[in-house]
């Protein structure tokens, strides 16, 4: 079992951790999150971005991680970026706790997410169904108030 973690920080009150666990290269990856300080009772986009560079805040993380050159989509879509995790749901206090298994995200192997950045967005991900060009790239999920580089745990 290989485990990786990202500690979320940014220019907002949003903090938390996102962990990734994968047993072997062909196994799905379990993604778990515990995030506090976001908007209450909301759905907010969460994606893995290309670069592990946070020198200019979360904006320097670049676009969604997309090694197969697909368009943006929902985590359950056949056509999607590797980094497309959809939306997290927050409770009345703005906290989100959850987990999901994903077949495209890899901790182990050539398309590993290690050293890349996970970003929690300020808006809701439209899952590529927004009817415009930006939707097919970002899901119109908006600004990047918190992020963290994914590293071996």
From Swiss-Prot:
Binding site for substrate: 144
Xref: InterPro entries: SOD-like_Cu/Zn_dom_sf (IPR036423), SOD_Cu/Zn_/chaperone (IPR024134), SOD_Cu/Zn_BS (IPR018152), SOD_Cu_Zn_dom (IPR001424)
UniProt-annotated binding residues for Zn(2+): 64, 72, 81, 84
Residues that hold Cu cation according to the record: 47, 49, 64, 121
Keyword Metal-binding applies: yes
Top-level taxon of the source organism: Eukaryota
Name of this protein: Superoxide dismutase [Cu-Zn]
